[in-house]
Amino acid sequence: MSKKRKKRSPCPVACSLDLLGDKWTLIVIRDLYLGRSRFTELATAPESPPTNILTERLNRLLESKMVRQIPANDGTKHRAYELTEKGRALRPVLEALRDWGLKWIPNTQTLLGKVI
């Protein structure tokens, strides 16, 4: 069931943070960029959220049309996830966060490499 979230303001920064600003959503999007596409791959990634939170974040990303479900590419009836155009449009945001972290947070290293 879809919950209609009330906007706290018309500010695009506030609205974007309402959708993306929790602890896990951008990590899930990053992992999709890194090629993880199935729930089990996302759930076993080094920085994965608990599975109940992963399910909730994926549902929110599906609802907001940043991610879509597709058939798994292994011929099974399992489903996979991929970023939509809207989700891929977050690439510069992830790159900016990566670059900022590399510059200002000691002992960080990129997982994204040339992927984004």
Where are these regions (language model features)?
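Basic, amphipathic "hinge/linker" alpha-helix immediately C-terminal to the N-terminal HTH DNA-binding motif
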Residues: 21, 73-96
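Short beta-strand "wing" residues that participate in macromolecule-binding interfaces
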Residues: 69
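Basic amphipathic alpha-helical segments that dock to polyanions
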Residues: 54-64
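N-terminal helix-turn-helix DNA-binding core of bacterial DNA-binding proteins
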Residues: 11-53, 82
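Amphipathic alpha-helical dimerization/coiled-coil segments
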Residues: 91-116
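A detector for short, charged/polar N-terminal pre-domain segments
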Residues: 1-9
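Glycine-centered, phosphate/nucleic-acid-interacting loop/turn motifs that mediate DNA/RNA or nucleotide
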Residues: 24, 65-66
